[in-house]
Amino acid sequence: MRVVALCILAHASALGRKKTNGPSVKVSATLAVDKKVVGKADALFKKRTAASCDAAAKIYEDELKRTGYADADLLLKAADAVNTAMRIRTNSNTITIDGTVETPANKAVWKKDGQRAYDLAAKGLKALDKKVDARALGIRFDAFMFSCSHKSLVKQALTGTGTAYKRMGEELQAKHPRHDGDVGSAVLACFYHVAPWPVGSPKKAIQNARKAVQRGGATLRNLYYVAVISYGQKDYATAAEFFKRAIKASPGSPSEADFADFMKSEAKRGLAKAQEMLYKLDLRNDEIASNSSGQALWAMPG
C-alpha cells in the first residue's frame, strides 16, 4: 500500500481550478466515439498489466483526439489506464515499514505520466459536470497523487499540495465510504502517517486505518496499512497480528490487486521484523525483572 505525502502551491487548485495542459475540453464531440475501438482498448485494460494498460491508454487517447476530447467516460477510462500502469510499476506509492517507495526509478514513472493522467481526469470531471461519482473522484485522486509524487509527497505535506490531497481524501471518505474498500480513509491514514509535524498525526493515522477496515472491509490493503502504521508507532504486537491477517487476506478491488504481490511480500517482511522486535522486548523485560529481583534480595536484611 493505495499510501498514501503531498508539487507546489499551484496544485492546491486541483479541486477545480488547476490549469491543465494539452487540448481543452470542447462542449461536444465532433464525431461519435467508435465503440469497436473502445472495446478493443477495454479488453486490453482488463488484462491489468503495465504494458496492456499502456496500450489501452494510447487507444483511448487516440480516440479522444479524433472525437474532440468531449466524452467524459472515455476521458476517465484513459486516465484510469494511465493510473493503473503507474500503480503496477510503482506499487501505488504505498507505505512500508521503512517509509515510502519514492525511489528515483518510481519518480521517473510519475514524472513521465502523472500530469498526463491528471489532465485527462480533470477534463473527465469537467465533462461530467454535476454527475461526478465515486469512480470519477477516485480516478482523479490517484492521478493527482501520482502527478505530485515525483517531487515527493512527504516533502509537500505542509504545502498547498498537501492541503489539496487531504481534501480529496476527505471528500471520498465522506461521500463514498464503501468505494474501493473505503479508500478515502485508507489514503488519509497514509497521509497522517508520513506527513511531518504539525500535519502528521499518529492518532489520526491509526484511527483512519482502522476506520477503513471497519467500513471498507478486512481487505489486504486495509489490514496491511493498520500493520505498517502500528509498526511505525512501535505497537509491534498489533503490527504482527495485522501482518498475519494481511498475508492471508485477498485484495478487495482491482486497484488493490495491482500491487497485492508487493503488499504480501512486505507483510511477510514486516511480520518477521515485528516478531523480532517483540522478542527483543521480551528479553529486555526479563533482564529488567531479573535485575529488580536481584536488587530486592540484596536489600533484604541479613
Over which residues does each language-model region extend?
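Universal eukaryotic N-terminal targeting presequences
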Residues: M1-G16
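Short coil/linker segments at helix-helix boundaries
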Residues: G22-A55, Y69-D73, K77-K130, A134-E171, ...
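Mid-length scaffold segments of soluble, non-membrane domains
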Residues: K175-P177
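Short amphipathic alpha-helical heptad-repeat segments
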Residues: Y236-A240
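Short, solvent-exposed mixed-charge patches
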Residues: M300-G302
